[in-house]
């Protein structure tokens, strides 16, 4: 890799570190190519990305970013998983690590907050942004439907009363 390619990679990684909500660092020693492809496809489905980069270049790219706290984790064969959704990358990495013991989560960062492996696992248990949005919409819509039911209930009762009077008059 020549100097310009390295500079391009550093600027790309710097952009990744500044624009994404969460970065997870893990060791991948012993993962097969098939396992890595499976991890990449699962990340892609969740809206996250996995990148393997030289630790030295990733360390340079971390300078001046909010997630610079992950620098000490960049030792050995490390991969970086990141996403704009604060939960997606952590959730996929933790789920994959449960089924494949070769992927060892070292930690990560969410904004300026450094996360240890337990912090990443705790982050993975939280609902995603889409799930939270769906719950919020449901909570907002629930009172509106209840109001509509309450408003319509007296009208329905009135209609039944008038219907009963009409039947009574017809019978008489």
From Swiss-Prot:
Gene Ontology cellular component terms for the protein in this record: large ribosomal subunit
SUPFAM superfamilies recorded: Ribosomal protein L10-like (SSF160369)
InterPro entries hit by this protein: Ribosomal_uL10 (IPR001790), Ribosomal_uL10-like_sf (IPR043141), Ribosomal_uL10_bac (IPR022973), Ribosomal_uL10_bac_type (IPR047865), Ribosomal_uL10_CS_bac (IPR002363)
GO BP terms: translation
UniProt superkingdom: Bacteria
Subunit composition and interactions: Part of the ribosomal stalk of the 50S ribosomal subunit. The N-terminus interacts with L11 and the large rRNA to form the base of the stalk. The C-terminus forms an elongated spine to which L12 dimers bind in a sequential fashion forming a multimeric L10(L12)X complex.
HAMAP family for this protein: Ribosomal_uL10 (MF_00362)
UniProt protein name: Large ribosomal subunit protein uL10
Organism: Methylorubrum populi (strain ATCC BAA-705 / NCIMB 13946 / BJ001) (Methylobacterium populi)
Gene behind this protein: rplJ
């Amino acid at each position: 890799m020549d100097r310009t390619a390295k500079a391009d990679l550093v600027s790309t990684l710097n952009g990744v570190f500044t624009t994404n909500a969460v970065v997870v660092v893990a060791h991948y020693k012993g993962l097969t190519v098939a396992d890595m492809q499976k991890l990449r496809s699962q990340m892609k489905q969740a809206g996250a990305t996995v990148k393997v980069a030289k630790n030295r270049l990733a360390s340079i790219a971390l300078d001046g970013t909010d997630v610079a706290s992950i620098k000490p984790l960049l030792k050995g064969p490390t991969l970086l998983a990141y996403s704009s959704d604060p939960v997606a990358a952590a959730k996929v990495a933790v789920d994959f690590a449960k089924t494949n013991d070769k992927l060892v989560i070292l930690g990560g960062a969410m904004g300026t907050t450094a996360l240890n492996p337990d912090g990443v696992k705790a982050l993975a248990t939280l609902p995603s942004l889409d799930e939270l949005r769906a719950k919020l919409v449901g909570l907002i819509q629930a009172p509106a439907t209840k109001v509509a039911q309450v408003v319509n209930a007296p009208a329905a009762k009135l209609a039944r009363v008038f219907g009963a009077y009409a039947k009574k008059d017809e019978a008489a």
